[in-house]
């Protein structure tokens, strides 16, 4: 796996895009909440609520589902306005496989790029070569094999996918439990069986061996998709997530500022039921949402880019 990307050819210049640096940048977000925002005003609400970063996009996932059509990278002017409005890191999404959208976002100076299944895929066979960029990438995964393939391509952070835009946390739960269970299975295998496991996972043996030895991914593992309440966020943290992405669940609720702050606090105090009970009071109505079990196969965003 490459470990030395830099935008400066001088051997004495600091390396700005190595795997170590990019993964370290993602580590800085650990334990926090990343919120989808569509305006500078929403970005300020997220920052004031304690978000560690914001995801700039033109439509939250629930609106993408409702309105349909082709979803693409956001307008650079909109991304710039959000970057100007807040002091916390700003992420933005590109379509799966759309390396030119990624080049544009890197040139804008975003802090992280999310190669996202929420947008309409640009390439159904290939993902972006993330080693070719100095900016760190976030990618989604529904299982361990998918996570390892994205890491092999250069992802610096993995988020379990869930079903974005539904407000239904069930798929996020399934994906996080699945990834953690598969990691524990690798730990139980004798070394000579890891070769077959690597073949089954369609991932490099050395990466599989590392996970079997350490019991965790070599990058940060966040969760996403359907998280709408403080209890949802706390449950995902207790299941092994190292942080939380929240999309439609905040700004499609009755009181976005109050709910955003509550979800941030729940992520921090995820193992304290008394605090969770206190911050769950008086939040107003959560987003109405969609039962993920009723989605047709074509409407399941998590199936994209596997």
Swiss-Prot record:
It holds the Pfam family SOR_SNZ. The active site is at residue 93. Signal peptide: none annotated. It catalyses: aldehydo-D-ribose 5-phosphate + D-glyceraldehyde 3-phosphate + L-glutamine = pyridoxal 5'-phosphate + L-glutamate + phosphate + 3 H2O + H(+). The keyword Lyase applies. Its EC number is 4.3.3.6. SUPFAM superfamilies: Ribulose-phoshate binding barrel. CDD domains: pdxS (cd04727). Pathway: Cofactor biosynthesis; pyridoxal 5'-phosphate biosynthesis. Belongs to the PdxS/SNZ family. PANTHER family: PYRIDOXAL 5'-PHOSPHATE SYNTHASE SUBUNIT SNZ1-RELATED (PTHR31829:SF0). Catalyzes the formation of pyridoxal 5'-phosphate from ribose 5-phosphate (RBP), glyceraldehyde 3-phosphate (G3P) and ammonia. The ammonia is provided by the PdxT subunit. Can also use ribulose 5-phosphate and dihydroxyacetone phosphate as substrates, resulting from enzyme-catalyzed isomerization of RBP and G3P, respectively. In the presence of PdxT, forms a dodecamer of heterodimers. This is Pyridoxal 5'-phosphate synthase subunit PdxS. It comes from Salinispora tropica (strain ATCC BAA-916 / DSM 44818 / JCM 13857 / NBRC 105044 / CNB-440). The gene is pdxS.
């Amino acid at each position: 796996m490459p470990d030395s990307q830099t935008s400066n050819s001088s051997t004495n210049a600091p390396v700005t895009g190595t795997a170590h640096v990019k993964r370290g940048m993602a580590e800085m977000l650990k334990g926090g909440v990343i919120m989808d925002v569509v305006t500078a005003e929403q970005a300020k609400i997220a920052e004031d609520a304690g978000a560690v970063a914001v995801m700039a996009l033109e439509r939250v996932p629930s609106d993408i589902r409702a309105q349909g059509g082709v979803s693409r990278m956001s307008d650079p002017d909109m991304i710039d306005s959000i970057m100007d409005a807040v002091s916390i890191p700003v992420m933005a999404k590109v379509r799966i496989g759309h390396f030119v959208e990624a080049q544009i976002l890197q040139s804008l100076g975003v802090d992280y790029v999310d190669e996202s299944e929420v947008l309409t895929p640009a390439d159904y066979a290939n993902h972006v070569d993330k080693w070719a960029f100095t900016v760190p990438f976030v990618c989604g995964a529904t299982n361990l094999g998918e996570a390892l393939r994205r890491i092999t391509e250069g992802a610096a952070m993995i988020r379990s996918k869930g079903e974005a835009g539904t407000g239904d946390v069930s798929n996020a739960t399934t994906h996080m439990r699945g990834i953690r269970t598969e990691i524990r299975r690798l730990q139980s295998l004798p070394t000579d069986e890891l070769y077959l496991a690597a073949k089954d996972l369609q991932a490099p043996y050395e990466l599989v061996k590392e996970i079997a030895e350490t019991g965790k991914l070599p990058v940060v593992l966040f969760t996403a998709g359907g998280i709408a309440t403080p209890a949802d966020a706390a449950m995902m943290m207790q299941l092994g997530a190292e942080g939380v992405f929240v999309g439609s669940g905040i700004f499609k609720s009755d009181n976005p500022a109050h709910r955003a702050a509550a979800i941030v606090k729940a992520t921090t105090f995820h193992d304290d039921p008394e605090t969770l009970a206190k911050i769950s009071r008086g939040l107003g109505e959560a987003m109405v949402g969609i039962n993920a079990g009723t989605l047709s196969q074509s409407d399941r965003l998590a199936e994209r880019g596997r």
